[in-house]
């Protein structure tokens, strides 16, 4: 059965260095996907700097909705702006930082 999740009902995750809302996940009725809306403040406004991380068993798809950023990964540095997509393979350490002057807004997908 199809399910609609209103913007205000997305679960807010307590993740360091960013505001993250889990729009779709197993907890919201999805079987095989997780979708997050992530907002990262400009570097000079951040109280906490995020560390690199990785996903052991899944790819991550990062789509830029607003702003400018750079993802620092094992395989290189990837500058990103509105409309860009980055596919991060399993086990690759990475972190995305805001390199612009306004909020960096990302839509992140995991299988």
Segments predicted by a language model, with ranges:
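A short, N-terminal "cap"/entry segment at the start of jelly-roll beta-barrel domains
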Residues: 1-37, 42
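A generic "binding-loop/recognition-motif" signal
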Residues: 19, 57, 76, 92-93, ...
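Short histidine-centered beta-strand/loop micro-motifs
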Residues: 24-26, 47-56, 73, 97-99
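Conserved short histidine dyad/triad with adjacent acidic residue
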Residues: 36-56, 90
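Residue-level recognition of conserved beta-strand positions in structured domain cores
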Residues: 37, 66, 73-75, 98, ...
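Short, conserved beta-strand element in jelly-roll/cupin
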Residues: 39-40, 54-71
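Ligand-binding loop in jelly-roll beta-barrel domains
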Residues: 70, 90-111
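Short acidic-glycine-tyrosine-enriched beta hairpin
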Residues: 75-90
């Amino acid at each position: 059965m199809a399910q609609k999740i209103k913007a205000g009902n997305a679960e807010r995750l307590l993740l360091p260095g960013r505001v993250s809302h889990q729009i779709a996940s197993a907890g919201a009725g999805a079987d095989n996907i997780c979708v997050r809306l992530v907002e990262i403040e400009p570097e000079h406004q951040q109280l906490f700097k995020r560390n690199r991380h990785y996903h052991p068993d899944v790819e991550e798809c990062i789509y830029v909705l607003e702003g400018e950023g750079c993802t620092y990964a094992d395989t290189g540095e990837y500058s990103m702006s509105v409309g860009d997509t980055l596919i991060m393979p399993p086990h690759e350490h990475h972190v995305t930082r805001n390199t612009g002057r306004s909020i960096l807004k990302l839509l992140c997908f995991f299988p």
